[in-house]
Amino acid sequence: MCYKEEVQKKNGDKLQRRFEEDSVPKFIQTYFINIKSKKGAINYYIAIKDLLLWLMDKKIIDKTSLKDITPEDFYEVESEDVTLYLDNKEQSGMSPTTLETRKNIFSSFWKYLKRTKKCPVKENIIADVSYKGISSNNNIIKKFPSETQLKNMEEKIMKKKDEFIRVRNLIILRVLKGTGLRESELAGLDMSDLYLNEDIPYIKTIRKGKFREREAVPVYLTGDATSAIKEWLEYRSGLKNIIDMDAVFFNKNGKRLNENNIQDIFTTYGYGVTPHMIRHWYATVMANTGNLAFTQQQLGHSSVNTTVNNYTNGIYGMKDVLANM
């Protein structure tokens, strides 16, 4: 079993444990089957569970436990109830961007309730929810790092005395800047995923493909990312204590890096920069070249509209300019 499959299985098991601990009814569990990313399914469950607990607390669903909820209970929930939930959450400090995401999750869940024969729900009430959150696109300037932040991060890594840590972390930063990979995709990279001698060098990573099935897809490399990986492979060839031989990146003990390890690198050296901010930085640079179809392919978006809505923004490149005016 490869790393990516292990992570999926681990998250799938974690989700199932939550179902068992909360005694979640089967008709609710069924909704999560079609969410291919089990990590995503966990986040969906957290949001849906929170809404259901709130509905029970307000006696809109007249039950005291998740296990007692029946399909008929959803017939009592109205769009105004969900609007009030979202308003209350915002007043409690939850960000409008997060709440907009939750609203989308609830819409997906109610579409399932409407579709399944096990539930009497006849319409997707979320369509009439009046709460207006903030699109993640409106928060774009907070999503990508400034050139100053990136330079400071690189300089801080360069000061690390431990050669292995210094070399590896610099390479990781360059690869992320040149691919837009997610942490999980970088952690899951195997030696067999590297195609560095092709006319256009690329790596393969597992993403959602057609019909939401997970499949290996190419991500093409910038010149610097290609050079960085080649430099790492040369350095890697001189290391003696590699345990996970398939892994491209690993820790000092020779074991594959995981997502938390990569996040820790950015916590230590990043000056507030996160791996996902690097992904936004890469995506915005790519989108501003004008080739949106290629950018969509590189990021693994299902629709070019997602790319347009999130990454074609005139503010890119202006953060440092404005700060120095």
Predicted regions and their residues:
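Conserved tyrosine-mediated DNA breakage-rejoining catalytic core shared by Y-recombinases
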Residues: S184, G188-A228
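N-terminal core-binding DNA-recognition domain of tyrosine recombinases/integrases
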Residues: K10, V24-K39, I48-I140, K159
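Short basic/aromatic active-site micro-motif
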Residues: V167, K255, Y271-T289, S302, ...
